[in-house]
From Swiss-Prot:
It comes from Human cytomegalovirus (strain AD169). One of its GO terms (cellular component) is viral tegument. This is Early nuclear protein HWLF1. It is found in: Virion tegument. The lineage of its organism: Viruses, Duplodnaviria, Heunggongvirae, Peploviricota, Herviviricetes. It comes from the Viruses.
Length: 576
């Protein structure tokens, strides 16, 4: 019997500890749990009231943090996480750095209020001692009250809440680092046998994960996304042949399907593996996919969205995907330094700065909010009757959206009392924050740089850019003599690989480019490089290609995928 890897064993233990065999009605206890959640929200906000009352006064906020340095505050989602107050000068990873100018899409100022820590798990012998493990995450407040978390391990800045009230309600639900931590419970736990098979697989072995998916071909995983009550099916495929047999890919011409495989190979700069399709089922049977879930050779999980035919990173590995679901495409905002967001294939973060400034300006509150106003608002949010006079009318609010049982927060509040009694163990000081290479350099001074996309006529009759502005047509340099959009040229001498072998080479084989005219073109958008052996090498190749394409004015060619109304009753194109 083969031994499980350390990652698989930790994931398996976390999964077993979180299982609850009781029915859903018994778990949420109808009205009682909603009232209890309001109580937990009020207790969290009351512990953060010092930050709430000083969120628009940076000097007062800095003084407050210095005076309460070392104080431990219990947070939500997960409930066993804490905030340890610490001033910015005591955190070397952010000291003397301008995070707002290097990461955010708009000018702003960020003030550090402390680092995050986690209580030891139940199996830890030191759990009953007053010790907590610090994490490589810094909690920060912006000039407009927005809450951010800077993760120096992966050098990412996350927008976790629009204000402290929302942070008290949702906690760290929108912090990506939470779902990389081994103690975080899994959101996707059913069907039990399917999940167990994946948890026993090494998450960094993409071939093994794809093989497991292929063994379950035709079955569904129940994908749950934290903070959302609805579930989505993940139809397991595990092979390119299975993908070709599913709609709408079975109605794609053979040339377009080969272009799609080539596009994915070129975007990832390495070989890749099919996992399955996410979407929804119609009442009369057909499955309508919204995206293709796939892995690169390093085990990173991506989603190829059918809506815009592009790739987006959704998890660092499949175990993390079982924890966070599709959260990264449901509103999680990650800001990266320089070119790294494009190298990681992260979705472009949504800018909330202009909207919040406009809201404050419309209410006449831009730069004029006083402490007395905040005290009045706090008095209303902490009213004793909030748990009974704010009951939702819709049934969707009764779902289980907490990462841990709500009562765990009260337990950790008692454990951390008094606030200075908890000893914290320092986190690892190294991380990607120390990098200063090609991936961290800006492109023409642009913030949040992403490669522009070109939508071909079969997908969108009039192409538009990211801002909705109509692009020039006809004589555009993005089309060749035949009127077809110019594809991203392959690397010279490189034959794209597909780890999954095809039974029908006419339909699914990814054609090499060593004999084509594009491969011989000396103006290839990016130079020839060897296949990457590490994820960092793949990042460098993606960054170099993006800079070369940007310098030549090239755009990404989006392969058209048929919409349901464009598919007839005829079968797939047999190809040449």
């Amino acid at each position: 019997m083969s031994l499980l890897t350390k990652a698989a064993a930790e994931a398996w233990g976390t999964y077993l500890r979180q299982r609850d065999e009781r029915c859903e009605d018994a778990i949420r206890c109808d009205y009682g749990v909603f009232q209890f959640r309001n109580t937990v929200f009020q207790k969290t906000l009351s512990m953060l009231q010092g930050l709430y009352l000083r969120q628009y006064d940076p000097p007062a906020l800095r003084t407050y943090v210095q005076r309460h340095q070392g104080t431990t505050v219990a947070l939500r989602n997960p409930a066993n996480w804490f905030l340890v107050m610490r001033e910015q000068a005591a955190i070397p990873q952010i000291y003397a750095r301008s995070l707002a100018a290097d990461y955010l899409c708009c000018d702003d100022t960020l003030e550090a209020v402390g680092v995050l820590a986690v209580r030891p798990p139940d199996s830890d012998l030191t759990r009953n001692t007053k010790q907590a493990q610090e994490l490589p995450c810094v909690l920060m407040l912006s000039h407009y009250g927005t809450v951010y978390v800077y993760d120096w391990e992966t050098d990412g800045l996350y927008e976790v809440a629009s204000d402290i009230k929302a942070f008290s309600k949702n906690g760290l639900l929108w912090c990506e680092y939470v779902y990389r931590h081994p103690q975080t419970p899994f959101a996707t736990t059913e069907p039990r046998y399917h999940v167990q098979k994946f948890l026993c697989t090494d998450p960094t072995d993409a071939a093994a994960v794809a093989k497991t998916a292929r063994e379950m071909s035709g079955l569904n995983l129940v994908i749950r996304t934290p903070g959302r009550t609805e579930v989505e099916p993940l139809l397991m495929l595990g092979s390119i042949e299975g993908l070709r047999a599913c709609r709408p890919f079975d109605h794609m011409p053979a040339a377009d399907f080969r272009d799609l495989l080539n596009f994915i190979r070129q975007r990832l700069c390495c070989e890749w593996y099919v996992v399955g399709l996410v979407g929804y089922y119609l009442a009369y049977g057909p499955f309508v996919p919204s995206g293709l879930v796939l892995l690169d050779k390093f085990g990173v999980v991506y989603l190829h969205k059918i809506e815009d035919s592009d790739l987006y990173r959704i998890a660092d590995n499949f175990h993390m995907f079982l924890k966070c679901g599709l959260l990264k495409l449901r509103g999680l905002c990650r800001f990266d330094r320089g070119l790294r967001g494009e190298c990681r294939l992260e979705e472009l973060p949504v800018c909330h700065h202009t909207l919040k400034r406009d809201v404050l300006r419309w209410h006449g509150a831009l730069g004029t909010i006083t402490r007395s106003q905040l005290e009045s608002a706090l008095d209303w949010f902490l009213r004793p009757t909030r748990g009974t006079d704010k009951v939702p009318n819709n049934s969707s609010a009764w779902g289980r959206t907490d990462l841990l049982p709500t009562g765990a927060l009260q337990d950790n509040q008692n454990w951390a009392f008094p606030s200075h009694s908890v000893e914290t163990l320092p986190a690892l000081q190294g991380g990607l924050w120390e990098d200063n290479d090609e991936t961290t350099q800006t492109v023409d001074g642009q913030r949040c740089f992403r490669m522009p996309k070109f939508f071909p006529p079969p997908m969108c009759r009039v192409p538009y850019n990211e801002c909705g502005v109509e692009l020039p047509g006809g004589d555009s340099s993005d089309e060749d003599e035949s009127g077809r959009p110019r594809r991203i040229a392959n690397r010279i001498g490189d034959t794209p690989e597909t780890p999954c072998n095809s039974e029908n080479e006419d339909d699914t084989t990814v054609e090499g480019t060593s004999g084509g005219p594009e491969a011989m073109d000396s103006q290839a958008p990016y130079p020839s490089e060897d296949s990457p052996t590490t994820e960092k090498e793949a990042w460098l190749q993606r960054g170099r290609r993006a800079k070369a394409m940007h310098a030549r004015g090239h755009t990404l060619k989006q392969v058209p995928i048929p919409e349901p109304d464009q598919m007839g009753d005829d079968g797939p194109d047999p190809g040449p």
